[in-house]
Curated annotation (Swiss-Prot):
CDD domains: Radical_SAM. GO terms for cellular component: cytoplasm. It catalyses: adenosine(2503) in 23S rRNA + 2 reduced [2Fe-2S]-[ferredoxin] + 2 S-adenosyl-L-methionine = 2-methyladenosine(2503) in 23S rRNA + 5'-deoxyadenosine + L-methionine + 2 oxidized [2Fe-2S]-[ferredoxin] + S-adenosyl-L-homocysteine; adenosine(37) in tRNA + 2 reduced [2Fe-2S]-[ferredoxin] + 2 S-adenosyl-L-methionine = 2-methyladenosine(37) in tRNA + 5'-deoxyadenosine + L-methionine + 2 oxidized [2Fe-2S]-[ferredoxin] + S-adenosyl-L-homocysteine. InterPro entries: Aldolase_TIM (IPR013785), Methyltransferase_A (IPR040072), RlmN_N (IPR048641), RNA_MTrfase_RlmN (IPR027492), rRNA_lsu_MTrfase_RlmN/Cfr (IPR004383), rSAM (IPR007197). This is Probable dual-specificity RNA methyltransferase RlmN. The gene is rlmN. SUPFAM superfamilies: Radical SAM enzymes (SSF102114).
Length: 364
């Protein structure tokens, strides 16, 4: 639930008259109902309407009294996202351009795998981290999303899947924005979708990725939640990483590894390192050796990502043969590594390509 204190703390949150009903955890809904003089068990009914029947309005909750429905409408909105554009890739990946209630736009991606359907969600409108290879950061940060707006992305995709009786089985928090810069709303989202009373998506089927906001890595390590954790690394040396990711000037590689060691001591969980390969920048065998030396001894996996084309950026994709050589060298040095399957690059839905492109074109 978004309180006045939360808004004061998070200056990039929207200032809507009513908050999204999807921003409430089940226990928060129970507590709110009791505070309003209502019966606690109504929370179960409300969540069934929201997450199982997936209604679009409070008026559709017909087993609630008219007075309770009015009370809910007076205090909350059922956040609905307007689908501006829906594009499907030749590999089955679907990208949604959603419009929020204040007119801003975000992108969300549905990826189909043999093991199920995965949704890549966005946590911010824009991004201020400034990675020099990424489209998401080109327009800067506009605002943070409420937890309910992140939940709504998953629900809207799930509604699209209902027609074919499919379900969202995995969530990756790797869309537009830096999740750890919207930490409280991200954690609220995680606890909501993981709850048995809502979408009931298992913690080990959810992955959150960060560019390396070190104070929040320590916070995340202290959370009692078994979410998968990934770190965008992209280089083992500060000089190269700072060129790719200016955030490294504030949180350098040495401090980042220390934070990851703390995370593993607290959680005993594996970390995934995301390593984008940029032609002539970080893709040589010497870079593989530097990476192996840096992370040796950590319980980790390296996800090698061929760079995706962004018109405003000058990076080029590493040759396929060099990608295989890089992977082979890591494995020779005892590092668990795989090459990420490319999905959605033909519709600008792949890693580093997400932004509100269509809406920007329309409003010029």
């Amino acid at each position: 639930m978004i309180t006045a204190e939360k808004k004061k703390k998070n200056k990039f949150l929207p200032n809507f008259d009513k908050q999204s009903i999807y921003s409430l955890r089940f226990d928060e809904m129970q507590n709110w109902l009791v505070e309003q003089g209502q019966q606690k068990f109504r929370a179960k009914q409300i969540f069934e309407w929201l997450y199982q029947k997936r209604v679009d309005s409070i008026d559709e909750m017909t087993n609630l009294s008219k007075d309770l429905r009015q009370l809910l409408k007076d205090n909350f909105t059922v956040t609905t996202l307007t689908t501006v554009v829906k594009q499907e890739s030749k590999d089955g990946t679907i990208k949604f351009l959603f419009e929020l209630q204040d007119g801003y736009t975000i992108e969300t991606v549905l990826m189909r795998h043999d093991y199920g359907n995965s949704v890549c969600v966005t946590t911010q409108v824009g991004c201020r981290i400034g990675c020099t290879f990424c489209a998401s950061t080109l327009g800067g940060l506009k605002r943070n999303l409420e937890a309910g707006e992140i939940v709504s992305q998953v629900l809207t995709v799930q509604k699209a899947l209902d027609a074919t009786e499919e379900r969202v089985s995995q969530i990756v928090i790797m869309g537009i924005g830096e999740p750890f810069e919207n930490y409280d709303e991200m954690m609220g989202f995680l606890r909501i979708v993981n709850d048995d009373n809502s979408l009931n998506i298992g913690a080990r089927h959810i992955t959150v990725s960060t560019s390396g906001i070190i104070p929040r890595i320590y916070d995340f390590a202290d959370e009692d939640i078994q979410i998968n954790f990934a770190v965008s690394l992209h280089a083992a040396k500060d000089e190269v990483r700072s060129r790719l990711m200016p955030i490294n000037r504030a949180y350098n590689v040495e401090k980042l590894i220390e934070a990851i060691q703390y995370y593993q001591e607290k959680t005993n969980r594996r970390v995934t390192f995301e390593y984008g390969l940029f032609g002539g920048v970080n893709d040589q065998l010497e870079h593989a050796r530097e990476l192996a030396h840096l992370i040796k001894g950590l319980n980790c996996h390296v996800n090698l990502i061929p760079v995706n084309h962004v018109p405003e950026r000058n990076y080029v994709k590493t040759a396929k043969n060099d990608i295989f050589k890089f992977e082979k060298e890591l494995k020779r040095l005892g590092i668990n590594a795989t090459i990420r399957r490319e999905q959605g690059s033909d519709i600008d839905a792949a890693c580093g390509q997400l932004r509100a492109k269509e809406r920007q074109v329309e409003t010029r």
